[in-house]
């Protein structure tokens, strides 16, 4: 099977000092000659390291992002970061709607939609996280939840913005974190097919859908070979640069 146009990256959550982030960036830059053109690599550090990581990786094809942002350009939003600020740091991607932010910080489909529109306005690629909880899955509500989240994410896109690059990351809430149980490849692919169909109906273009949720060296190859999975969004298995490079190599061999 041959696949291309895949996205494989990692978000570090609230981890890594600036020094630790630069060790990762240095290791990734040093391995740039071994990159596979079929795979778009990306890393999403904490805010405190994003600019420096971007600068270190500027000569590579690695895209660098932020883990969140506000929808306003500026204003009385103490503690927030605006899309203007992210653009000023020369970042490429912004992660939006992660389940931890939905659960602990009151993110809603509406706020994710506002942020998506703001990101596109400022030339950032939104990486929108969606996923059902265990209770929703067991109640047979997964597909309904995913459809609502996708449509909410795109609700404020208008005109040309509806054709701008966007990414979706399917991260079932029960599959992420230390105690997460990875979705089976079949289950994940079925959800990806639905998500892709809903997104294409909403925007009129194909939207890449990445899988995230306890991705590791043991399951990355089976996952990436599924027909509707367009990439991998990796957690702790890729927080060490060696682990990230290992998964990249496994994916490249598999496709």
Curated annotation (Swiss-Prot):
InterPro entries: Aldolase_TIM (IPR013785), TIM_sf (IPR035990), Triosephosphate_isomerase (IPR000652), Triosephosphate_isomerase_AS (IPR020861)
Protein family per UniProt: Belongs to the triosephosphate isomerase family.
Main location: cytoplasm
Catalytic residues (UniProt): 98 (electrophile), 171 (proton acceptor)
Protein name: L-erythrulose-1-phosphate isomerase
Keyword Cell membrane: no
NCBIfam families found in the cross-reference section: PRK00042.2-1, tim
Functional summary from the UniProt entry: Catalyzes the isomerization of D-erythrulose-4P to L-erythrulose-1P.
SUPFAM superfamilies with a match to the protein in the record: Triosephosphate isomerase (TIM)
């Amino acid at each position: 099977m041959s696949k291309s146009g895949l996205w494989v990256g990692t978000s570090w959550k609230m981890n890594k000092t600036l020094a630790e982030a630069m060790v990762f960036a240095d290791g990734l830059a040093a391995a740039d000659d071994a990159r596979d053109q079929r795979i778009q690599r990306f890393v999403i550090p904490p805010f405190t390291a994003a600019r420096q990581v971007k600068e270190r990786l500027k000569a590579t094809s690695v895209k660098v992002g932020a883990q969140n942002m506000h929808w306003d350009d500026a204003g009385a939003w103490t503690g927030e970061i605006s899309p203007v600020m992210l653009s000023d740091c020369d970042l490429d991607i912004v992660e939006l709607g992660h389940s931890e932010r939905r659960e602990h910080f009151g993110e809603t489909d509406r706020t994710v939609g506002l942020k998506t529109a703001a990101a596109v306005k400022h030339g950032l690629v939104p990486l929108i996280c969606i996923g059902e909880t265990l209770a929703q899955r067991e109640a047979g509500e997964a597909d309904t939840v995913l459809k609502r989240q996708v449509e909410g994410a795109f609700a404020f896109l208008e005109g040309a913005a509806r054709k701008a690059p966007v990414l979706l990351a399917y991260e079932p809430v029960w599959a992420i974190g230390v105690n997460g149980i990875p979705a089976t490849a079949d289950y994940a692919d079925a959800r990806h097919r639905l998500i892709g169909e809903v997104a294409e109906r909403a925007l009129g273009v194909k939207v890449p859908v990445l899988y995230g949720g306890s991705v590791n060296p043991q399951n990355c190859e089976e996952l990436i070979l599924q027909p509707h999975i367009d990439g991998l969004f990796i957690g702790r298995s890729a927080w060490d640069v060696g682990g990230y490079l290992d998964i990249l190599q496994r994916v490249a061999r598999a496709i």
